[in-house]
From Swiss-Prot:
Name assigned to this protein: Large ribosomal subunit protein uL30
Annotated organism of origin: Geobacter sulfurreducens (strain ATCC 51573 / DSM 12127 / PCA)
Similarity field: Belongs to the universal ribosomal protein uL30 family.
Record-level Gene Ontology MF annotations: structural constituent of ribosome
Subunit structure: Part of the 50S ribosomal subunit.
Domain of life the protein comes from: Bacteria
PANTHER family on file: LARGE RIBOSOMAL SUBUNIT PROTEIN UL30M (PTHR15892:SF2), MITOCHONDRIAL RIBOSOMAL PROTEIN L30 (PTHR15892)
Record's keyword annotation contains Ribosomal protein: yes
GO biological process, any: translation
């Protein structure tokens, strides 16, 4: 496992639940095509799994 994850928001948050929007805000993803680099921790991986249909992840 690599030490960092590169996470990109590929779908809009419009029409999602409030919990999914909270997860996206927690990841720092506010706009489509925004990319963040975060540490590969179990907490981050769990958040990514909650919104896996909306993001693209590269290790």
């Amino acid at each position: 496992m690599s030490a960092e994850l590169k996470i990109t928001l590929v779908r809009s948050h419009i029409g999602t639940t409030s919990k999914q929007r909270a997860v996206l805000n927690g990841l720092g993803l506010t706009k489509v095509n925004k990319t963040v680099v975060l540490k590969n921790t179990p907490e981050i991986v769990g958040m990514v799994q909650k919104v896996a249909h909306m993001v693209k992840v590269v290790e």
